[in-house]
């Protein structure tokens, strides 16, 4: 969030797309080593790099190497798995905070003055929409993330179920995990299905798959304006926009449907940035709101599809019977369960601190009907 901080030159706006606290102050330095910048960071002082851009990237890499050295403590899963998860997230947050203390000054109209700096205009337009008329400070690590996201957006993500690509800008969750899309493409549809809702559409990929499967009238909803714009562009690009009406609303439209699909965030924890709201759902708020509200929006004999993994159970963040209790409370009956194993890199990375849970993870599609 924007916040004005003092520097050794003048007060200036500090921007950070996470929920981290702004530094107390910042100092402009031509060049410095990783040790000096980290020392400043521990004192809540940001370092603004005014020298060569490529040198700044090298120093940032050195900072990452320093703070991500393996712990001296015995490796392996904690006896308290839930504690291990929260400790992992805390460590990630602390490391991110330190890395974000190396910043650059963004000149008006999204420009950089640093030597050998790239053109960042398009990448920052994806994030902020309106170009700046005054300079501001931005963590270098975040800037590099914005540039990477912009390149991914241009390239697009191949979606085999669509025989096409989905393009996702910064601020919208990217469907890099394809296993749940297979479930949506394979789950049986009722004969003569006419209407469907995609709740929390994000990039629009689920709505697109439903349209590709022949459902003629789909409403896709989201509360994120960036997601609405993203989904709209993707469906137009895929030639599926005539079948899908995209609405900026929370959860359900006022009408009813034959099929209602939701892929809520899978982990009940607090997000630390806007993009993490697609990953973390405090107290399973969206999950329970969907289940408790979906019944009254289903047409007679209609189905609700819930896509969710059991990672939260393996991390001891959710009881194994939690979902069944939610289904009972919402007067929903499970008529079928489809499942698959994740294929993404973290699922098979034994060096991942949460590998002990990820290698047990299964992704499910629950087909639900009103009792």
Where are these predicted regions, by residue range?
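Glycine-rich S-adenosyl-L-methionine
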Residues: 275-299
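Class I S-adenosyl-L-methionine
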Residues: 324-371
